[in-house]
Structures are given as structure tokens and as C-alpha cells.
Amino acid sequence: MARRIPEPFRIKMVEPIRQTTAEYRRQALQEAGWNPFLLKAEDVYIDLLTDSGTGAMSDRQWAGLMMGDEAYAGSRNFLRLADTVRELFGYAHTIPTHQGRGAEQILFPELVKRCRGERPVFLSNYHFDTTKAHVELAGARAVNALTPRALDTGAAYDWKGDFDLARLGEIVEAEGENVAAIIVTVTCNSAGGQPVSMANIRAASALARSKGIPVVIDAARFAENAWFIRERDPAYAGVAISSIVREMFDYGDMFTMSAKKDGLVNIGGLCCFKNDEALFRAVQVRCVPMEGFITYGGLAGRDMEALAIGLKEGLDDAYLSYRIGQVAYLGERLREGGVPIQTPTGGHAVFVDAARLLPHIPAGQFPAHALACELYLEGGVRAVEIGSLLLGRHPQTGRQEPSPFELMRLTIPRRVYTNDHMDYIADCLIDVKRRAAGVRGLVFDYEPPILRHFTARLRPA
């Protein structure tokens, strides 16, 4: 039976949420072009679209907002943030950005410029959507080398975020000087929020360094990955989360971070460098016209203060055990109800295998997106597709290719919802499962050329 872990905090403030009728929700979804991204937030009862910037800050973070130094240059909040980065990660150089994609847009073009090959390529365990988009906007290719064990969602395996090291080595040999960087995504969002083992990070880093390839850590969910390493790897049992984090980042050369996840803030990102001062300076130059001056990067001083506090709060043992335990609780409720999910559950979300739940819907009609629409119609719960709609078309041929996954992500905001909300979500999805055979696929009315899933408009097939 699913186990409930109580929240390790008291609730000081509440925000009312509104339940609506099935008829109201159908009208709202039609007006949104059958795209949950385009729904009004006020029409959503429980919002599981993303964990990015949707969490609740602590009383200490709110107090930190009052300490904001809004100086255009040299803010003391920036200096505290840079000190926190040095303390936690051991990286000497910090550039704040408005969010993770801001870090990607100033870093990736410089890595492409440094690449010695004529057809630059970035390799990753699995690029997330915005990462892939920024790689391609920089004129490079994005190639994934994920362990094939992640593809069987019904089979439990502790490290479904790992690189397929044999494949990674083959690609490195085949591409040679074209490899601009290896990106280690922790946790691996597109595979189901799955962790990457320390041994795998170490091996990928060793391969990269043997070939002179820079290692970029996509660090959005670094603390959750460290928790999994401690819980699942006997070599790290009882080791402090902070020590595990420090070792993880020792294997990288730089990192990008959407701080809106494990930084526990509503806005913010980081682009940090261990010791490559020349690259740091080149990226700083891009920061000024794209993000803002180098000591604020599109952020208010108060937000940098909240981030400096949140980076440390996110390493708290009680918080992480509750956080990941709540996700596991929802996953277990769904398993008990016969809903197929990525097993074991990851750190930030439960990923429902829509290909198994809706086998009658082809990849080109986006089964996971159809399931997300049906869940909203059932109970006002907003989820998101991680599948063929998100994957997009092949950048050279323009053909729609099926994704290796057709997943619906139930993304749990941090410190926002209780276990009673998890029960409601599970009940709604189990009800949808009972009538799954009647769920229809979707086709485009409007298809944007880039990151289409955000603004596309669709209709039932």
C-alpha cells in the first residue's frame, strides 16, 4: 500500500483554488486549442504542468526578499550568490541568468565557436526540449545516448537516467572534433525524472576529458539526483547530500541551471564555470546584451538573495525525503489502480506511459497529449506531454519521428500540494483509465516551427 510521508513544514499562508464543472472545462480546453499550456491558470484546479518556478518559498526566503540590493552593478546579493556557488559546487565563476534557457543561450554559441569540427554536435544522456532547441539555434546537432534500460517503463532499474556508455564512446569516436560538449542532465527529465549514478557521471567525464571535450552539467535537479545516489548506491549510504553534490560537480567543467527547480525560487538561473576564465569572459560578453549586466543577469537583487538561501534549503534531508516520497506516493497510488508509469518513480514527477495506456492512438496523434487533455476534462488537473509532440520534427528532413517515449508528466511543485491532492489526482486518472479506449488522438490546427508544444493549437482527430 502507498505510504504517506507528512510534510516537514507548517503552512503559513494559503491560496484558494477553484473547482469547475466538466462543461466549463471542455469549453476552456476548446478555447485553448486543446493545449493545456494555453489554459488560463484560474481555470486549473491542480496544476502539474511543471515544477519550474511553481514551488513555495520558505519564511527565510521571504525574509531574504526584504534584503534585496537593487544596485545595477555589484549587488551584495550577487556576491552572496557567487559565494554560495563556490561553497556548494566549487565553481569559481558565476553568471546569474533569468532562468535556465538564458544560461543555455549565452553558453552554447561560445562552445560551438570553440568546436574544432565543421558539424558541431552536443551529446547528452537526454537533452530536454529547451536544451535541444538552444543547441540547434546555435547551429549544432543534439544527439542522445540514454541507457536502453530506460525505455522499458514497466521494468524497475535504479539508474534509468544513465548514459549508454558504449554508445557514447562510439559517437565520440565517429564524430571526433565535431563534439562541442557532453551534457550530463541530472536528473534526466525526459526519461522520467530518473537519476544518473555517480559511477556513470564519473565514466562519462573521464571519456570526455580523455578526448579534450568539455563537460556541461544540466543541473536543474541536482539535489534530487544526489538524494537518489545516497539512497540507491551502497557506496554513498550515510554520506551527506552536500558531499555527494560536490563530487558530482567535480566531474563537470561548467554547469547551467534552471534555479526554478532545486533552487526553490520562482525565477532565476545560473551559468557557472569551474576554472575556465577565458570561456567565462566570453560568455559574460554575451550576457550583457542578452540577459543584462553580469552581476544581475535579468534578476532583481531580492531574487538572487532568495536563490542563495534556496540552494542550501534544497539540500535538507527532511525536505528531500518528503519531496521524493510524495512523488513516490502518487506513483504507488497509480500503480495500485493499474495505471502504467515509468518505474521506479523519479524525483520531480510521475510519468504515465500513454503508449501503453492508449495503444490505439498513433505517435503522430500524440497519445500523451491526448491523455493530458482527458485528465483536465476529468478533474481540472493540468499535466504535460513528454513525447512526440515535444520531440518535434527532424531538423533536416522536417518529418515527424516517433519519440522513444510517449509519457504524460505529472509534475509536482515543491512545497505546494498535500498528499490529499495526490489522492485526488490518482482518483481522476484511474477514472480516465477505465474509459481509455474512447480517448481520441489530436491533430494540428496550428504548428509553430520551434518548441511547438508551447503554443500549438490542435483538435480531436
UniProtKB/Swiss-Prot annotation:
Task: Write down the Gene3D superfamilies for this protein, in alphabetical order.
Answer: Aspartate Aminotransferase, domain 1, Type I PLP-dependent aspartate aminotransferase-like (Major domain)
Q: Which cofactor does it need?
A: pyridoxal 5'-phosphate
Cite the EC number: 4.1.99.1
Instruction: List modified residues, type N6-(pyridoxal phosphate)lysine.
Output: K261
Question: From the UniProt record, which GO molecular function terms apply?
Answer: tryptophanase activity
Pfam families, alphabetically? Beta_elim_lyase
Pathway noted in the entry = Amino-acid degradation; L-tryptophan degradation via pyruvate pathway; indole and pyruvate from L-tryptophan: step 1/1
Superkingdom of the source?
Answer: Bacteria
Assigned keywords, A-Z: Lyase, Pyridoxal phosphate, Tryptophan catabolism
Q: Which SUPFAM superfamilies match?
A: PLP-dependent transferases
Report the catalytic activity. L-tryptophan + H2O = indole + pyruvate + NH4(+)
**Cited InterPro entries:** ArAA_b-elim_lyase/Thr_aldolase, Beta-eliminating_lyase, PyrdxlP-dep_Trfase, PyrdxlP-dep_Trfase_major, PyrdxlP-dep_Trfase_small, TNase, Tryptophanase_CS
Q: Does the keyword Lyase apply?
A: yes
The entry assigns this protein to a family as follows:
Belongs to the beta-eliminating lyase family.
Q: How does it assemble?
A: Homotetramer.
- Write down what this protein is called: Tryptophanase
